[in-house]
């Protein structure tokens, strides 16, 4: 258990809303296990209050912060510095306060790739379909492209946003994805041909658990299907894929590994991943036998 003292450092979660987040549970367990004199707190920050919240982090000497929806892209102009990877992605999910200089990083992409590695999927040369075009989609699209993914397809409810992301990838010298409107019939052949189908939208997240971004009959046996939503642990999207014989990965895995990378940025230490994984799965009512891929 963390003993809060006058010297205890603070780490924040900035988002709107944040009441559902498991990050405080995960990081406080990690700080305790690693002997770090830090405590992690969630703050519901409305978009109009973002600049003031960052000024508060700096004034109060916070060690750093995580950034979640809807601030991952909007926060960049308010930071003092941005890591080149995060700048290229155009989204920040982690902040480190370095001598009153707030520097933004993106651990979503590296956390996503590590979750694929732990599950046994190598994206090099593979075909991937990404559903969504927000901050998380940007991170995983850049991660897949830089990892040598053979082809990318983007699908979003507003295709203009997906087209902008495709342009950003092309502008960075990476292969430009094909773009669809989410749910268009023409997508079906792309989904069926894909090695990896990834949902980065909020469709299916509690309490709207009956929603799914794709009909399950678009999947084929042997595909990898990944949902960044982790509440519920098995979404309707993943349940449909599992019934079709797909190998599935829960969003809890990306939460775990992006969190582990953020822990290292704040502390300079290797994260206690086993502790973080156990706490997350206990919170979700799942077994703690490791990442949820294939289960």
UniProtKB/Swiss-Prot annotation:
Swiss-Prot/TrEMBL keywords: Amino-acid biosynthesis, Aromatic amino acid biosynthesis, NADP, Oxidoreductase
EC number, UniProt record: 1.1.1.25
Pathway this chain belongs to: Metabolic intermediate biosynthesis; chorismate biosynthesis; chorismate from D-erythrose 4-phosphate and phosphoenolpyruvate: step 4/7
Keyword Aminoacyl-tRNA synthetase included in the entry's annotation: no
InterPro entries in UniProt: Aminoacid_DH-like_N_sf, NAD(P)-bd_dom_sf, SDH_C, Shikimate_DH, Shikimate_DH-bd_N, Shikimate_DH_fam, Shikm_DH/Glu-tRNA_Rdtase
Superkingdom in the source lineage: Bacteria
Protein residues bound to NADP(+): 132-136, 156-161, 228, 251
Protein family (similarity comment): Belongs to the shikimate dehydrogenase family.
Protein name, as recorded: Shikimate dehydrogenase (NADP(+))
Gene: aroE
